[in-house]
Amino acid sequence: AARFDEPTQLGGFSEIIKPGAFKRSLASDAGPKIRAIYEHDSRSLLGRMGAGSLRLFEDAQGLAFEIDLPDTQLGRDLPVLVARGDVAGCSFGFIAQGENWEGETRHLTDVDLFEITITADPAYDTTTVQVRGKQPSTLTLARLYLEACR
């Protein structure tokens, strides 16, 4: 999950995601367009909320997701790479719609989320992803911080 209320260092400032920051985006007309991709490559589509293959939800800790991977080469390779630990993190693409600054800390209160990405080189080392369930084609995010696409 994108952990709420935990600071993340991003170069010259830190960022804290506040509870509810994703709520509007997930419920909006754009929610079905949110996609899961691999390595920030839009050609490497893994799932989409509108198709039901990507499920995103806020819980008490933050934002979590599940992906039903496609029956493609990438969809078959990714669980193997995750299980081996070669691919172990996640990033996000978003546009901040609500933010407050306290000194060098940005508090995100509302974001337009447009992608989650599974990656071998996450901007946040604390992110993890895991294969879960009897079907190896389902990936579940365990801990995820938010990365602004810049």
Task: Identify the residue ranges that each predicted region occupies.
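Residue microenvironments linked to proteolytic maturation
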Residues: R35, G52-C149
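Flexible, gly/proline-biased loop segments at the beginnings
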Residues: A1-P79, E102
